Amino acid sequence: MKKTNLGILGGGQLGCMLCMAAKKLDVYTIVWSDDPMSPAKEFSDEFILSNYNDEEKINYFTKKVDKITFEFENIPFDILDKLNSIKEVLPKPQINKIIQNRILEKNFVNDQNIKTTQYKKINNKDDLISNGDLLPAMLKTATLGYDGKGQFKLNNLEDCENISLSKDSDYILEKMVNLKKEISVIVTRFKKNEYE
């Protein structure tokens, strides 16, 4: 019986864990990353080092793999969408488009009737100052921030006046809340609409 070939975009820590779990299931892993220092390189069966829009690599990757997934959310949507037009990408690229952007993500969660902290989209310093009622708050870049990067704690209007905002970025201002507990919930839906 032929082994399943799993294509994984991104080579970080989650890619390592995915490769280790796949080995236990006798799944062959092909990791594609644009980072030569990717830790998953050491755990994958095959490693492709290239930027994600390399046509030659796209052709090779999609011919070699049976399924495609990604191990972090910052794979460009257009790349995932292109790959998905050739070979199925799971989760669907549209889901990743939402989680790549904190504003879209918060809107989506609220549309599901799940309450979040109060938040506002911020385009410039005037927006920031006019939403002082949310202070103290966290100002975050709408995209590409993770593990504390692109995040700024604002305690008062003076902090808002002193912060420098990039004209090339959208931001989200999130009201601080007193946490009693933080939990993470992962839900898996299989193709036959079974949930775990």
Q: At which residue positions do the language-model features occur?
A:
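ATP-binding N-terminal substructure of ATP-dependent carboxylate-amine bond-forming enzymes
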Residues: 1-104
